[in-house]
């Protein structure tokens, strides 16, 4: 199995790249989705997060992600505390899913905070999606985020330069969806499929 990490800053287009890779036959695990699942009520991380951050982050008994974000995004110590709870649980959940896959599979782990979680060494190959910051900001505005929230979230992540230090392949996503699709198809044909085939031998 070829284990690929797919990373990039908020608003870069990671999810779209993940969707295209899935259409091309890769199996995609979305760490953001797993992060939501591991802190749902009744899940392993729920009690830990509520104990760490208090009842003010709850809405009707569930952890309210926007309330939690408001607490942690301005405080790097609190953000690190949250990450120290969530990251191990997400890794464990991803590993369980990976164990069910056939040996020749291409497994894409979509991980926004790959550098921050020091997770690159667990993968055979790292792909970074990057885009001009103003384009990313515009995409995030379209998602309904306010400018100050966008600034906080971008500031909470490492720079593209830091991501590129651990990257094997960079996909620029400043253009059209057609251009992005062609770039992802080239990644699959020229890099991922040959590597997966070699591993399967």
Regions found by a protein language model. Give the residues of each.
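Short, acidic/turn-prone active-site loops that include or flank metal/cofactor-
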Residues: 33-36, 57, 131-134, 155-156, ...
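Walker A (P-loop) phosphate-binding motif
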Residues: 1-26, 31-33
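ATP-dependent small-molecule kinase phosphotransfer cores
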Residues: 33-106
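Residue-level signal for inorganic ion chemistry
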Residues: 13, 32, 82, 108, ...
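An amphipathic alpha-helix signature
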Residues: 24, 46-50, 133-138, 151
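ATP-dependent NMP and nucleoside kinases share a basic, alpha-helical "lid"
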Residues: 93-101, 106-142
């Amino acid at each position: 199995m070829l284990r690929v990490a797919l990373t990039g800053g908020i608003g870069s287009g990671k999810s779209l790249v993940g969707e295209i890779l899935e259409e091309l036959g890769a199996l995609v695990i979305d760490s953001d989705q797993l992060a939501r699942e591991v802190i749902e009520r009744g899940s392993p991380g729920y009690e830990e997060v509520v104990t760490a951050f208090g009842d003010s982050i709850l809405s009707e008994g569930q952890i309210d992600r926007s309330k939690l974000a408001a607490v942690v995004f301005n405080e790097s110590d609190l953000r690190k505390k949250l990450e120290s709870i969530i990251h191990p649980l997400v890794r464990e959940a991803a590993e369980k899913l990976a164990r069910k896959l056939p040996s020749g599979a291409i497994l894409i782990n979509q991980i926004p905070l790959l550098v921050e979680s020091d997770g690159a060494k667990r993968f055979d190959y790292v792909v970074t999606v990057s885009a001009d910051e103003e384009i990313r900001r515009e995409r995030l505005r379209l998602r309904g985020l306010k400018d100050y929230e966008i600034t906080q979230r971008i500031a909470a992540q490492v720079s593209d330069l830091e991501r590129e230090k651990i990257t094997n392949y960079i996909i620029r996503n400043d253009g059209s969806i057609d251009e992005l699709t062609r770039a992802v198809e080239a990644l699959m044909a020229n890099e991922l499929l040959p590597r997966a085939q070699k591993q399967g031998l």
